């Protein structure tokens, strides 16, 4: 659709990985490199397949926006997308122009973003409050990996979502909902402030 302006991702940092710790291409990714854009099985393969469909139908612009809590997250999306495009083009499974399309900032962008909103383990007080409102089935439990989970999420009130304002097909007015749009350099500075200067160090000190 020409009106589609952005696709957002929250798949964790590992979700963008193409290789294992030894640098070997993951089995599912390697298989999709050979299959091409017609029937990929991996999540990333399906995403790039949709981009290829967009390329074939007018080379329409779009922003691929990672909202995962990892440094320079847009670069991780870009690396995954271009790797798939290159693999398919090299094998003759996609038109050669596709590799250039996903690298053209006027066609496909990969904005950086920084998100900060602490979501601690489920709180018994919140469970009790929701129960008082008539909501049932909220019992928390511990998984086999010792993760404390529940059907509800509680979070701090303070929240920030800062996104690089690079949207080649325009964007929704998300600033009306509190999203901060700025340039890439400022996104990087805000992230460093969070991780190295203000927020995370203070939280660590308070925890100790």
Where are these regions (language model features)?
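Substrate/ligand-engaging "lid" and interaction regions
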Residues: 1-208
């Amino acid at each position: 659709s020409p009106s589609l302006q952005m696709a957002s991702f929250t798949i964790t940092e590992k979700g963008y990985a193409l290789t294992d710790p030894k640098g070997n291409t993951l089995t599912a990714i390697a298989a999709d490199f050979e299959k091409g854009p017609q029937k990929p099985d991996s999540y990333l393969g399906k995403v790039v397949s949709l981009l290829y469909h967009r390329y074939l139908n007018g080379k329409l612009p779009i922003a691929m926006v990672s909202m995962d809590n990892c440094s320079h997250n847009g670069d991780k999306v870009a690396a995954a997308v271009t790797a798939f495009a290159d693999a398919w083009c090299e094998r003759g499974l996609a038109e050669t122009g596709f590799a250039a399309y996903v690298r053209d900032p006027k066609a496909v962008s990969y904005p950086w973003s920084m998100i900060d909103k602490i979501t601690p383990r489920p709180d018994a007080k919140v469970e009790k409050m929701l129960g008082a409102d008539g909501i049932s089935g909220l019992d928390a439990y511990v998984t086999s990996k010792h993760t404390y989970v529940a059907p509800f999420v509680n979070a701090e009130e303070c929240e920030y979502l800062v996104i690089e304002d690079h949207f080649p097909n325009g964007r929704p007015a998300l600033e009306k909902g509190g999203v901060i749009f700025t340039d890439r350099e400022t996104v990087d500075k805000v992230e460093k402030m969070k991780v190295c200067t203000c927020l995370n160090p203070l939280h660590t000190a308070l925890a100790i």
